[in-house]
Amino acid sequence: ITAKVMAMCTGNVRRMEDMKLGFFAKHMAKFAGINSTGVGMHEPYKLQLVIDMVGLPRVLLAGFVSAVTRPFGVKGLFYKICGHGVAGIDGFYFRSSFDRYKTLALINPEHPVELSNEIEKECGIPIVIMDANDIDQNQLGKCDDFPLTDDQIQDAMKDNPSGQGGELTPLILIRPLA
């Protein structure tokens, strides 16, 4: 199951209209790197959400370290320093296939292993919660009885069968080939 579906099911959703955009988010976003995989910290509302989640001092430190190391080709330190699942924030996509998703941010579930076990207990189907895209596949949690190893799960998800962009496939069934 995609982490984004679980974010919606658990209420880990932030609405743009419920957020107050602050000075630092407005100004720091101008200096954030932009990539082709989605909306990053160059979106002021997304940066404000990070500030709300981890605090301004940590975001300022992460921004400073990123600015100093970027000229040397070091990337990703902002997300590592901020921690707390900041890389798992998804949303505020102005090019989204869903109009509502343009003003929503989804945050990965806080306790994915427990959530996986609860879903398995209720549905009788072993599940793994993934935050996957065309660049990386992040296994957030799996139920205790999941029949595959972590390596087998990563292998099954390496080409991102749920797709990216407009493909919007929230559930993937993994079964043996033979």
What are these regions (language model features)?
Residues 1-178:
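N-terminal and secondary-structure boundary signal
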